[in-house]
Amino acid sequence: DRPTGRLHIGHYFGSIQKRVEMQNSGLYDPYILIADVQALTDNFNNPEKVRKNVREVAMDYLSCGIDPEKTTIYIQSMIPETAELTVFYSNLVTIARLERNPTVKTEIAQKRDIFGESVTYGFLGYPVSQAADITTFSGELVPVGEDQLPLIEQCREIVRKFNSIYGDVLIEPQAVLSSGKRIKGLDGNEKMGKSLGNAIYLSDSEEEITKKVMSAVTDPNRIRKDDLGNPDVCMVAYYHNLFSKKEEY
């Protein structure tokens, strides 16, 4: 995860829940990356923010059940080999292919206030860096949210091209989807995000969570308390369904 702020429940259902499950199965040798170098691609003017949040992200991992005795947590900038691989992989990917990546296209559109009409090479090329992160440790299974699938596919393309030139050196990774889908924000937006201001953070206090849930979007057609509401457009009902057992919902 990128240390640009505290992690939220979208991160939990998107990948952390699956990571904890795989860790506790005893069948895998898990590695978790704190991607501080990647975080600088759109926070280049605020390195202190990235440095500070490395610790915050690590604490969020621990609070969710990531066990350092079973899982290796590492910081991207402390593994120089990934930077080396990124340079090699950059020769295998065209600018046009990076621009077609759906995840990258969406994120660039969301960051117009940072980049304007001209995105930096560093940000456009972060899928190449991500491929290096995965293959440095011969990653076979990568827990991701649904919106991250195009990044894994691009990594697989890089691996195939590299192997076609240099022989079967790299492992082609597989995405492991969490059981949950992309988590909606408090405002009803299809994605919860730090930059969107619609997130419930894993480290929020009980009072903060209560305040946020009380302000969440509900059915606008439910005017009176005893009116029947539509749970499909009520974020309170949506979160209740996420966290409660079936018989409680």
Summary of predicted features, one role per range:
Residues 1-3, 36-38, 140-141, 196:
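Short, histidine-centered active-site or binding-site loop motifs used for metal coordination
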Residues 3-131:
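N-terminal Rossmann-like or analogous alpha/beta NTP/dinucleotide-binding catalytic cores
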Residues 105-249:
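Active-site cores that bind ATP or allylic diphosphates and position pyrophosphate for catalysis
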